[in-house]
C-alpha cells in the first residue's frame, strides 16, 4: 500500500471512531469504556521530512494567526463577549470564533466528550487534513499522545492536543500557539529534526509537549515533532 493510501485509510478509520465518540481531548476527564481501552489505535506521528515551508495566507488565515498571538501570556479566553474553556481545544475554538467560524458547528456542545476530536472532525468535513510541506498561518496542528488519557501506560492516545500555527521559520521550524497547564504560550516544532529538543548553538527545534512521568512505557515520546499528528487547513 502506498504512503498516501495508508494515510487516507488511517484518516477515514480515525474519523469513523471519532464520530463514534470514543476519544478524549486535552481537557476532558471522562474515561473510555473498557472495550475501547483495549483498542490499539495507530498513533505514531507522521514524519514530514520535507516539511515545512510557509504558504502565504489569505486575510482570514493571517487574522487567525494574529489573534492566537494576542492571547500569548493570558489565562482567559474571551471572544465577542463569550468565554471559552482555558484548555487547548477551548483556545483554538475561541481563536476561530474571532473570524466567525464555529469549530463545533453541526456537532453540538461538548459535554464530557472530545474537544480535539470534534475539531478534527470539523476540519475533515470543512477543510483539509494534511502533513505539509506547506503550512498556512492560522492552520491547526494536531498531536497524539501528549498524555496517557486511558491510563494504560502505552502511547496509544490519539488526538490529545491542538494548537494554531503562527509562522514557519527559515529552518523549517513551525511556531504555533497553544494552551497547556502553564497558560497560553508559543511552542516550536521541527519535523525535519523531530528527535532534537535544542541544537548545540542553543536553537530550540522542538518544545516538550508531554511531561516525563515515572512508569512511562517504552516508546513514549515527549517532543512536539515526535507527537505530531497532522495539520488542518480550513476551506476559504
Where in the sequence are the language-model features?
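Bacterial N-terminal signal peptides that target proteins for export
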Residues: 2-13
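Cell-wall glycan-active module
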Residues: 3, 26-27
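Bacterial N-terminal signal peptides
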Residues: 13-22
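Aromatic- and glycine-rich peptidoglycan recognition patches
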Residues: 27-34, 151-236
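...with weaker cross-activation on analogous glycine-rich loops/strands in unrelated enzymes
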Residues: 54-55, 104-186
Amino acid at each position: 500500500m502506498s504512503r498516501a493510501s495508508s494515510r487516507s485509510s488511517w484518516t477515514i478509520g480515525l474519523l469513523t471512531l471519532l464520530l463514534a465518540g470514543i476519544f478524549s481531548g486535552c481537557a476532558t476527564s471522562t474515561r473510555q469504556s473498557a472495550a475501547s481501552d483495549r483498542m490499539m489505535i495507530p498513533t505514531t506521528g507522521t514524519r514530514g521530512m520535507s516539511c515545512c515551508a510557509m504558504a502565504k495566507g489569505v486575510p482570514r488565515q493571517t487574522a487567525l494567526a494574529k489573534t492566537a498571538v494576542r492571547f500569548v501570556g493570558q489565562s482567559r479566553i474571551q471572544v465577542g463577549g463569550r468565554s471559552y474553556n482555558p484548555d487547548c481545544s477551548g483556545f483554538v475554538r475561541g481563536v476561530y470564533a474571532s473570524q466567525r467560524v464555529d469549530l463545533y458547528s453541526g456537532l453540538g456542545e461538548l459535554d464530557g466528550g472530545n474537544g480535539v476530536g470534534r475539531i478534527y472532525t470539523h476540519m475533515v468535513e470543512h477543510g483539509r487534513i494534511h502533513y505539509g510541506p506547506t503550512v498556512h498561518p492560522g492552520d491547526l496542528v494536531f498531536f497524539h499522545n501528549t498524555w496517557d488519557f486511558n491510563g494504560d501506560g502505552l502511547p496509544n492516545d490519539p488526538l490529545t492536543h491542538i494548537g494554531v500555527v503562527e509562522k514557519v521559520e527559515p529552518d523549517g521550524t513551525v511556531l504555533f500557539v497553544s494552551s497547556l497547564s502553564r497558560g497560553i504560550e508559543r511552542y516550536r516544532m521541527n519535523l525535519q529534526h523531530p528527535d532534537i529538543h535544542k541544537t548545540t548553538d542553543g536553537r530550540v527545534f522542538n518544545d516538550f509537549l508531554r511531561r516525563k512521568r515515572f512508569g512511562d512505557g517504552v516508546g513514549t515520546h515527549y517532543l512536539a515533532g515526535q507527537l505530531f499528528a497532522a495539520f488542518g487547513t480550513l476551506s476559504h
